[in-house]
Curated annotation (Swiss-Prot):
The gene is pnrc2. Pfam families: PNRC. It comes from Danio rerio. GO terms for cellular component: nucleus; P-body. This is Proline-rich nuclear receptor coactivator 2. Residues 1-69 are annotated as: Disordered.
Amino acid sequence: MGGGERYNIPDRPAPKKSQPVSRGKQRSRDQNGVMHSAASGALGVPHHLRRGEKGTSYSWSPEARQAVSVDKKNGSVRFATPYDQNWESHLNKLLSAQCGQNYAGAKFSEPPSPSVLPKPPSHWVSLPMGDHRELMTFQLKSLLKVQA
């Protein structure tokens, strides 16, 4: 009933002896103004691209970062554009311009002809009346064992 042994496998290779080990992250900007951190890995690969996390990663433009501010405490997102308090009036204007009159439901000109309607399954449909009566009388006679 023995289980397999568990090992702690590090995410990144152990640092070489010649490289100084630093606990803090050192950040620098390249020619394009992109931030790189020394602790992010080899060859300047960003940390979020190097590690195999779920989800897609994308970078925000400076305009997008400026337009959206995230409230860390509540976890809510606030947009830089002011909230329009008159959204109901705008909605009513939009709906009145589209419709022009109140919507009362679907309108039908005529009912469809029976030939256009789909056929119901055979076990839903009753047998023709003549055959049905004969079958019913036979079943009743056999059940009651009465001779006619």
